[in-house]
Amino acid sequence: MAELKGTFYGVSVGPGDPELLTLQAVRLIRQCPVLAAPRTSSGRMLALDIARRALGEELDGKTILPLQFAMSRDRDVLRASHEAAAAAVRPFLDAGQDVAMLNLGDVSVYATFGYLQRLLEAEGYPTAMAAGVPSFCAAAARLNRPLTGGMDAPLTIAPGGWDDRVLDTPGTKVLMKNGTQLPALFEKLAASGKLAGSALVCSCGLPDEAVYPDLSLDRPEGPAGYFATVLVKE
């Protein structure tokens, strides 16, 4: 009889505010003996920090597995990074232990979980996803404004490095993970008459959160951090 393998869960923890964790996320974090989380080059594990703020001492005694992901556009470098992370997770799954990989925002939106999910599923490991609150929804709530109007109003979501034509699409535009490009973006918004009414939320729900409700009145002078979300609404 084949040994049962553990399940690899992608668990969304939201953008920063621990109150935005879903009941499902809390249950899975409690249930899984192993918690995997991305670790930045500076050693920060933001997704784990959010879970710890929500569950506190309940995480004591769990195995914490830091995952290092390369920040590169080189496909070979990225592939090696993903394979190394999958290799770190695999022994726990082989031992029959469930692993919860904690992801900022929602696990289905520009999340590193998807890379490992594909690799591990191809090897026969079971996987599952727990939905959460994406950063742009939390940013809209923080600004106290809806993302869309009527049912016919389109919504465009684009990550950093988008094509400039995105700004010409109708409806609301959500520009994510674009902190280093903010000065150039502000110039383009001003030139197209879209700066007034556009908003920026940096590090939504985190201790260093910054909110700019109207970029025509107030905006940062230089680049911002990675977790910057710009809402352009017409």
Segments (PLM) and residue ranges:
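A contiguous loop/helix-start segment that scaffolds small-molecule binding in enzyme catalytic cores
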Residues: 8, 99, 167-234
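Short, surface-exposed amphipathic charged segments that create phosphate/polyanion-binding patches used
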Residues: 77-85, 142-145, 169-172, 211-217
